[in-house]
Curated annotation (Swiss-Prot):
One of its GO terms (molecular function) is phenylpyruvate tautomerase activity. It comes from the Eukaryota. One of its GO terms (biological process) is regulation of lipid storage. The lineage of its organism: Eukaryota, Metazoa, Ecdysozoa, Nematoda, Chromadorea. Belongs to the MIF family. The gene is mif-3. GO terms for cellular component: extracellular space; nucleus. This is MIF-like protein mif-3.
Amino acid sequence: MPVIKVQTNVKKVSDGFEVRLAIHMAKVMKRPESQIFVSLDMNSRMTRGQLTDPLAVLDVTSSTVLTPILTEEYTVALCEFFSQELALDSDAVLINYRSLSPELIGFNGHILTENRPFISTDRARFIIGVLGIAFLAFLLQFLKYI
């Protein structure tokens, strides 16, 4: 459940910016749109050194492990999005990534680990398949004696 917090001093952010960001990042992160949370704080007083040019600072928090490969992919996608939407150069966008353990995130009245299955669907299918084959082998051996 990624959470993307955006702070910017850009004066005019078009309506629906946060929705478009959620849709864009759902595709990039390969997650359902309903799992992407976006918070937008516009017209923040911001500076980089003595410069007060338009900037954006993002905090991206996720319950999945964030690897350098993923954060590079996300950074490219976010910088392209902010360039198109807010006309910000990539050096005007700072992104802080945080990976939290699922038990540190609460949603829908529970922590995320409570909503996860004990084993994955693929693993369960594999186990059921192996048990089915073992049962058939046993049954064939049993039928030899009848």
